[in-house]
C-alpha cells in the first residue's frame, strides 16, 4: 500500500508513505531473475529480515540471503531499518549490528570474489548514534553506508492527525526527507574524513537535490520517490545537469601552463 500525497504547502514537495513492506516473490524467485542479468549492469542486493522473523533468528535471515545471493550481485546493502509496516526496526547499537554483520564478514572471507558490504541506516537515528554507526564502519570490514531509509516521522506534514491515523504506520519518503538525508550524509562524510563511500538516498526529487547530496559527500545516489513521480526523465535531467556543471567547471579552469 503506497499512499501518494502532496503536502507542506507546496505542490512540488511530494511524498509517499510506504506501508507495503519489502514485498517481493522471495529469495529463489530473485535468484532465477538474476541468473539472466546483463553483465553491464551493476546490481546491489538490498537485504533485510522477514517481518515475522523472531529476534533470535534475525542474523540467520541476513546470512541466508547473503550466502544465496553472493554470486549474483555486485554489492550488498544490509537494510538494518527494513520494516515499513510497523514503527520498529533492527536495533542500531553496535552489539546488535555486529551480530548481523560478523557472520557476513566471516562468509565473505572464504570466498574468491569480494562483494562490498554497506549498511543502510534510518534517518530517525539521533546524531550521536549516527556517529557510532560511522565509527563502526571505521573499525570493521564494513565498506560503506547507505543513507537513508524512509522516516517514521510526520514532522512538517500539513495532513491532519486523523487522516494520518487512517493511513496507518509506514515510512515516509520524498521531499520531506530531503534535508535530513543530506544532513546525515554530510555528518557521516565529515566523521569518516571522506574515506569511505556513501550512497545518498532520500528525498532526491530533482537535479538540484542530487547535486546537494553529492556536495554533502555522497559517492553515488539512489532514486525512489522522485522516480515514481517523475519517471525515467528524471534520470536524464540529473545526468544532463551534472554533465553541464562539469563542462562549466572545465571551461572556467585555467589551461595548463597559464
Regions found by a protein language model. Name each.
Residues 1-12:
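Single conserved hydrophobic/aromatic residue that forms the stacking wall/gate
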Residues 14-77, 82:
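Active-site beta->alpha loop and helix N-cap motifs at the rims of alpha/beta catalytic domains
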Residues 15, 24-40, 94-114, 166-196, ...:
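Alpha-helix-loop-beta-strand connector modules within alpha/beta enzyme cores
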Residues 46-48, 121-127, 194-208:
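Glycine-rich beta-to-alpha transition loops that act as phosphate-gripper elements at the mouths
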Residues 80, 146-152, 204, 210-237:
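Glycine-rich phosphate-binding active-site loops on the catalytic face of alpha/beta enzymes
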Residues 83-93, 136-194, 234:
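Glycine/Thr-rich beta-alpha phosphate-binding loop at enzyme active sites
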Residues 125-138, 190, 204-221:
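Catalytic cores of alpha/beta
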Amino acid at each position: 500500500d503506497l499512499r501518494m500525497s502532496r503536502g507542506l504547502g507546496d505542490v512540488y514537495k511530494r511524498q509517499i508513505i510506504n506501508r507495503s513492506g519489502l514485498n517481493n516473490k522471495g529469495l529463489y524467485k530473485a535468484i532465477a531473475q538474476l541468473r539472466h542479468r546483463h553483465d553491464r549492469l551493476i546490481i546491489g542486493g538490498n537485504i533485510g529480515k522477514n517481518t515475522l522473523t523472531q529476534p533470535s533468528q534475525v542474523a540467520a535471515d541476513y546470512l541466508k540471503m547473503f550466502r544465496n545471493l553472493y554470486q549474483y550481485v555486485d554489492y550488498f546493502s544490509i537494510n538494518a531499518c527494513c520494516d515499513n509496516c510497523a514503527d520498529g526496526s533492527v536495533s542500531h547499537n553496535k552489539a546488535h549490528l555486529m551480530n548481523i554483520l560478523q557472520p557476513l564478514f566471516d562468509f565473505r572471507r572464504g570466498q574468491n570474489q569480494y562483494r562490498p558490504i554497506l549498511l543502510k541506516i534510518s534517518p530517525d537515528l539521533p546524531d550521536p548514534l549516527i556517529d557510532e554507526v560511522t565509527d563502526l564502519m571505521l573499525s570493521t570490514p564494513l565498506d560503506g553506508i547507505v543513507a537513508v531509509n524512509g522516516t517514521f516521522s510526520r514532522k512538517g506534514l500539513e495532513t491532519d492527525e486523523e487522516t494520518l491515523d487512517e493511513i496507518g504506520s509506514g515510512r515516509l519518503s520524498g521531499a520531506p526527507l530531503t534535508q535530513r538525508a543530506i544532513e546525515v550524509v554530510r555528518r557521516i562524510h565529515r566523521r569518516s574524513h571522506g574515506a569511505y563511500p556513501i550512497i545518498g538516498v532520500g528525498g532526491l526529487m530533482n537535479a538540484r537535490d542530487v547535486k546537494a547530496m553529492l556536495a554533502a559527500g555522497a559517492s553515488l545516489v539512489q532514486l525512489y520517490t522522485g522516480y515514481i513521480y517523475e519517471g525515467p526523465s528524471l534520470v536524464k535531467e540529473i545526468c544532463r545537469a551534472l554533465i553541464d556543471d562539469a563542462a562549466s567547471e572545465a571551461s572556467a579552469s585555467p589551461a595548463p601552463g597559464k
